[in-house]
Amino acid sequence: MILKYSLLGNLLLLWMNIVNSVVLVGLYYGFLTTFSIGPSYLLLLRTRVMKEGSEKEVSATTAFIMGQFIIFISTYYPPLHLALSRPHTLTVLVLPYLLLHFLFFWNNHKSLFDHRSTHGNFIPNLSIQYVFLNNLIFQLFNHFILPSSTLTRLVDISMFRCNNKILFVISSFFGWLIGHILLMKSIGLVLSWPWEKMRSNALFRSNKYLVSKWRNSVSQIFSILLFITCVCYLGRMPSPIITKKLKESSKGEEKKKTEKERDVEMETISKTKKIEQEEERSVEEDLSISLEGRWNPYKIYETEEIRLNGKEKDEFGFKEKEKNELLWVEKSLLSLLFDYQRWNRPLRYIENDRFSNAVRNEMSQYFFNTCASDGKQIISFTYPPSLSTFFEMIQKKMYFRTAEKLPAEDLSNEWVSTTEKQRDNLRNEFINRIEAIDKGSLILDVVEKRARLCNDEEEQECLPKFYDPLLNGPYRGTIKKGYLYSIRNDSITSIQGSTKISWINKIHGILSKDYREFEHEIYKLDVKSSSAGIDDSSVSIGEFTEEAEEAEESRTRFKQFAFWGEEKEINSENQAEFLFDMVRADPNDQKISNQSIKIEEMKKKVPRWLYKLTADFDFEEEEEEEEEEDDEEEPTDDHGIRSRKAKRVVIYTDTDTDEDTDTNIINTTDSDQAKNSDQAKNSDQAKKSDQAKNSDQAEEHEMALIRYSQQSDFRRDIIKGSMRAQRRKTVTWEMFQTDVHSPLFLDRIDKTPLFSFDISRMMNLIFRNWMEEKSLKLKRKTSDYAGEGAKEEEHEEEKREYKRKEDKRQEDERIAIAEAWDTIPFAQAVRSSLLVTHSILRKYIVLPSLIIVKNIGRMLLFQFPEWYEDFKEWSREMHVKCTYNGVQLSETEFPKDWLTDGIQIKILFPFSLKPWRRSKLRSHHRDLRKKQKNFCFLTVWGVETELPFGSPRKNPFFFEPIHKTLEKKIRKVKKKGFFILKILKDNIKGFLEIFKEKIRWVIKIVLFIKSKVIFFFRLTRVFDPIPNNKDSKISNRIIHESPIRIGSRDWANDSLTERKINDLADKTIKIRDQVEKIMKDKKKKITESQKYIWQISKKRSARLIPKWNSFMKSFIERIYMGILLCITNIYKINVKFFLDSTLDSTKKILNRYTYNDETKEKDTNETNPNIIPFISTIKSLSTYTTTISSNSHSPIYCDLSSLSQAYVFYKLLQTQVSNKYKSESIFQYYRTYPFIKDRIKDYFHNYFHTRGISDSESKHKKLRNSGMNEWKNWLRNHYQYNLSRAKWSGLAPLKWRNKVNQHRTIKNNDLQKLDSYEEKDQLIHSEIKDFYKLGLLKSPSHTKKMKKHYRYDLLSYKYINYEYVKDSNIYGSPLQVNRHGEILSLSNYNTHKYKSFYVITINDCLEDKYIIDTDQNLDRKYFELRIIYFYPRNDIETRTSTDIGTFTKKNKTTKTGTNKKDLYIRIHQEIQTKQKEFFFDWMGMNEQMLDRTISNLDPWFLPEFVPLYDRYRTNPWIIPIKLLLFDFNGNKKSDLYIDPKVKSNQKERSNPKAESNQKEYLELENRNRDEKERQHQGNLISDTRNQKKDVGANSTGSDIKKRRKKKKFKSKKEAELDLLLKKYFLFQLRWGDSFNQRMTNNIKVYCLLLRLMDPSEIAISSIERGEMGLDVMLIHKDLSLPELIKRGIFIIEPVRLSTKWDGISIMYQTIAISLTHKVQHQTNRGYQAKKHIDENYFNGSIACHGGVRVNGDNNNYDLLVPENILSPNHRREFRIISRFNYRNRNVVNKNPVFFNRAKTNAQGFEKFVDRDKHFDTDTNNSLKWKVFLWPTHRLEDLACMNRYWFDTNNGSRFSMSRIHMYQRFGIR
């Protein structure tokens, strides 16, 4: 079995080696390159298809393989790669060959190569060589089928990673060869099929002509394909001949300027004869070039290169001019064929501020290179190019170094050994420092100090932090790059020269050895001017470039200094720089003699474009200067950049200056003729100048507008003549399309239905009207039940919305039509001609003809004609010519270039033909605005429209008035006829009624007579209705015979009454039957419903039976919780209220008589007069608390997949100190035993272990791999992530930010120590002075930074020791620890109510909200809550201090004062008042509580929420907004302003002693604050002596400056206005939309009125129409801003305050995580904390209950980091070195011991560690230092942690090379 496993392992190892080998990777990539087919495949296939012979096939295949091999070699050989990859080089080489190939060789190769002469001297056959050359050259072409650039990059990267590059190239070539053979074999099988068919065909075998014809056709097909391929390939490049020539920069001007400067320099050189001429010329030329380049940065450096390696130039460079003239012919020839300096790609020109010519985009910021990391060469993907070029230059100069390279293993071993030595040295130093502490040395002598560069050691005066080279980080600054023009010259006396002061690097000696001697004189640099522009970032002191000044006395006096940082200078010369080794000053003549090093500047010429491009509508100042200097040169309109499609439209031309221009022309011509002698030339020049001036004056007096095209211009800002990109993924399918779109996203963009595949959208388009009508009907039906007012409002809103959409749709249609006319060629000319034609026809032909016809018709109808009225109205109609946008010009003047730019014709007072003058036409729409618009525009079809390109409007019909009059007359006639018919109808109706009554009377008489006759004859008949009813019951009754004889009657002889009786009987029977039927149905339904209800109740009861028990339980619990607890709490509240009231009354009585007694109760408290409705807050917080408490002991299910680890890590770093782990974490941190005393440890251990709060025993745990599971376990132990699965899944991103982040752990300010600390003030102040003396505590900000470093350290330890994370915590600096504190017994405490472990205080849940830009000026317009200060209540009470979860101590000596547990808002020294009423009464904190009754109605039914309530009372950050706007005390006369100067003069009814104590306390606080502010307003140079003097009672003050005083308001309105402005501090003014439209309309009307002789009528009509606004005309130039705002011209838009971030700050915050300290959230920054620091803080690492008086918060620290003895740099270095195991990187199960001496000699630790029974069981956890594994985390986590571990304060030093992204190939 063992043999089998070993064989399997060997095979697996062999397979892994083969897979990772260079050969296999090369074969793989080579095989992939087979599918990138180029044009040479066509030639290769042609030889195989044509069957021209085996020799040609072999030559073609050989050339093909050789070309591919050259391509592979080019990847290894850079010159060949550049030659083949450069498109210009390849184009120049290939174009002549292609020209000869297609024009000459392709048609004549048979006659040239196949000609065989019978003579002896015959021409050899060159067809084989021709095929070889074709296949070889075409193989070098770029691929056009599957041109995978990604594949090429992968090949380059793979070769870059390989050690054996030649082996990789060869293997990739063989891989390609294998793929090529397989491809050719497969193609050969396909191509052999047509030849087999031809051979089997008898026709082809017999007819050779068909075979030759087929061969020629195939040859032509291949030639066409090859030609198309070459054209497509060359189409990607610019045309070499047909190209747009751009205007180059004016070289002539530069040459003239350089010549003038050199002439001036020649004069200065001739005057100075102290130095040799040749050296002086070289220096002057160098300086002139640098002066030319620095002083005028807009020039292009075309000067010659200066050679400094022993070769001297000719005198003043005249030979270079001749060389330039000779080279001009070559350059012109090259630029004629192909201009390599022009823009070949569709690049957009971005003009630079310093250089007018743009820099070529050929270099990137980062590129690949190898660098050393951990002793090995690995790849870096962000290697800076500047470092690489510098290293190459150094290697070239370092010729004395050996070229041999050590193996990689030796380098790694050497690095490991040196690192281990360094680690041992640091360990020894660290242990020696700890032993020194144990021996009793002062901590100040042991701690490693930071080195500073001092100016005076005795005075202890240091350099400013900006200029201290020994400091790094945020203290350093950056000198801005710029030009300094202020140089101090008055202080220099008898100076003949000047030199440059600069720092010399040691490396200059390696680069150059050219030493020369010069005599120079002292020149001092103005330090103030150089330090004027310094930013807060890392400094980079660059070179001081000097430049000459033209002067007679001084030879080389510098004119300016340019500071260049780490930026490459853009210059085409290798300037020389003289750096002086040493300077020796002579006080007599101030001359120096030194040696200078002449060094070539190490720089690279950055490629820049030769052309200075201008846009079409840019008017450059350089052209104007050229015209002024040389009048003969006419300005050229050769613009190189395409601007937005626009046209210049002249709207007004002023012709009043013609006379002035004529007189000026005459004067100029006379003066020119008088000055010059040659009359002919002068006259010509005068004419030219006159024409130019006339044209200039004409242009100056033209008022023009720029009309931009509405459609998108995809060519905007693209350089003319540059090649467009082949947009394979962009499609335009509409005439008017705003943007180009890709077909890939066709389903996501708005498109026409033709290209739409969305069926639902098409259905919506088809049935849109039907659906809208249906929805409107539904809305109306549902709105019927609402009120009438709501209906009308909804209807009006629908109408407005519909009108808005319709207007927008019509506007889009008009724009589309306008752009269509403007896009189609020659469309504007056609349209303009049609408009003019229609205008003439309408004005002079159509309308007069209609007038004539109308009047003739009136005369034929015998009516008076209206000739005068009609022609008068016709004469009012005006056809005004307008621009394409509608700007009115005049009736006779056409716009400039109106045939090409377009025209509009506006008809004012349009004529409408009427049947008669008295008739008033009414349009269909009763809109008053439309009545006022008595104008229209003319369309192409000759109809009228209201807007240009709008829909035609409906003109009133001529016969409409006639039709209306006829309708009125017909209506009148009908009305009269209806009246007559009504009268006749009424009369006829009355007659008929009388006639009917008469007939009834006659019938009655006849019936009466008939009845009498029947009765007379006694003929009767008995009526029996029962047999006639079928449904009735038949009764068998015996009918007795009547003694009376009954006669029979017939139905016909029956009377009317009998019939009625019969009918009534039938109806009653039917009704009775129906009632019976309904009763039966009802009974049946009732029985069925009863059965159904019984079934339902039976089912539900069966369901409810199992739930009955739980229901009863929950019901009983509700009753208990809701009723019983309420009763008990009410009883409790009443009892407490009674007790408190009695205690308060007794205390007041005692205070009246014992206010002079010094032994009073220390703890004081206030009552709350205004009760805050806190129930809602309690409910919300209780739900959150119960959720956490219920989940505290349940399994946690968290899904951290969507949460970035960097985000979590950043938030955890922001977690501040939480004291709820205060006591539990101390005794569980066993690794802190060496630094914790035994009695402290035993006390906490026994105390908590007896109560079972946590387990105190630890076990030996094996170090597991720090992976994702451990990371999640670490996160789960933080309660803010301890949520249930339902809660976790329900958290939205916004909720996560608003809730979880706000509920993160912060400092608990409620835990307070009450010991007095006054006894140790003197000792502490002396200690603080010592700390200031050493520079450890420079400022409070320095202390905060120290605390921040401790949090960084402890966070790292916390994660490394994640198995103990439940007990650990992140605390602050141990410098705040009090070693004199004692652990008291339980009997010393008043109360010891223990806080439940799951209860979270308000400090853990609510954090001060972060307000942006808290350091802004208070006079800015924004409202800040921190500037409002309050008084404490004057009625101060004393009580016994009780707290939940804290230990309080009752002191013997107490004094009266406010309890610091209740952090009331502090009193500012400048805010005092004499008023009682305040506008802002935040929870009664401003109220004078003298007349109030004492009450304490805190909600005690939930005791654990009392800290929440107290925190809510005292924390102004969580106050509702309503409390800012209402005065709950009923104060009506309130003012926002509180006068800080007026002191309180009221006589309070409070305790006078307490008030006096308060005043003394406030004065002390104010004095201390003034002292500490004076202390930290320091100058640039920090003086420790002044610091000693300024240190007062405060140990750590703040460097925050005093806030400015508020302005005093005159009235309440002004105060309210200021309050409004404070909310919005930024304003932006914008034009109102309505005003903008009105101004545009006014301008259009002005253009017309200026051209009219009598504009009154047009002006009045324009005002009536609403086109011209009088309010806009009355705008003056000197109107103030309030007036403009009042008129509605400007609108104020407030903008919220936001933070402006730059790239550096974003990078710093991303990589360098900065903690959000609580100092940023302090309520009153004027009140500063008092924090004291012990001397020997290592012996008392636990903050005991000593009297540390702080700003309401004390920190207890459970872990002390001993590394802080070292400096930060050594600390990080020691931590990194001690954590990594260099010999074996598999460190999962290996725990390197921190101290090597602990393994051999345990007594080394006994000196400073107290041994006990628990030490042996936990030694490993105390002494071992575990390894942090980097590769198990994401990149963002590495970036976050990398800032801390590797001391990268800024992001520039963070390199991705530390991440091993690829494994290097080994040499097999």
Curated annotation (Swiss-Prot):
Keywords: Chloroplast, Membrane, Plastid, Plastid inner membrane, Protein transport, Transmembrane, Transmembrane helix, Transport
Transmembrane segments annotated in the record for this chain: 11-31, 64-84, 87-107, 126-146, 166-186, 221-241
Cross-referenced InterPro entries: TIC214
Localization per record: Plastid, Chloroplast inner membrane
Membrane topology of the entry: Multi-pass membrane protein
Predominant subcellular localization, coarse grouping: plastid
GO cellular component, one term: chloroplast inner membrane
Coiled-coil stretches: none
Ranges where the record places region Disordered: 248-277, 617-643, 658-700, 782-806, 1537-1607
Presence of keyword Lyase: no
Superkingdom, taxonomy of origin: Eukaryota
Regions of compositional bias (Polar residues) in chain numbering: 674-683
GO biological process terms on file: protein transport
Bias (Basic and acidic residues): 248-276, 684-700, 789-806, 1537-1576
Protein family per UniProt: Belongs to the TIC214 family.
Function: Involved in protein precursor import into chloroplasts. May be part of an intermediate translocation complex acting as a protein-conducting channel at the inner envelope.
Protein's name in the database: Protein TIC 214
Protein species of origin: Nuphar advena (Common spatterdock)
This protein's encoding gene: TIC214
